Amino acid sequence: KFQSRMIVGFKKCLTAVGGCGGPLSRLLLKAGKSIFGDTSRVVRSGNWYGNDTAWRMVLDLNKCLFHFAGNGKPRTKPLKYCTLVDGIIAGEGDGPVAVDAKPCGVVVAGFNPVAVDTVCATLMGFDYRKLPVLKEAWKIENYPLVNYCPEDIVCKSNLQQWDRPFSQLQEREHLGFRPHFGWVNHIERSNIDPIPEKQLEL
């Protein structure tokens, strides 16, 4: 209650200050950023490479979705699932809120979210084995999310360079996405060059 009262009080104060003029309002915002940091440039939550809890939550929620019905009982039939990723104009950098647009002209689809995300991470220029949520998703034994190995994935594409088994896709050019600042230099595929920017124009 105290925290919510403080937030409401602060908003009222800012509203009153805003009525007094822009310079004072800007001064207060600048002071706030110097104390608390710019929201888009400060890691306040789990969005950094060392977080060892967020990926567990994501996988647990997916286990519940795929293996249990809404009433909490085990599913009698496997959940039918189709993943569609719109990467026509994707986002890179400080996501999911403050992304920079990245035109890629790519749509990815599949019937298993672990496989689709693994392929997407690879196309983006990331090593899925360095992303805990993907690396660990392939290892689950109790209530698994996927019943095959990454090497079993076969990608079908209208681009010859991506129309191949996943094991070969990992050795091909990628889209060269810039990761969130909390993940820079921790997830990139360093051995393969990105596709030149001019080839990504729509």
What are these regions (language model features)?
Residues 1-202:
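Extended, low-polarity segments enriched in aliphatic/aromatic residues
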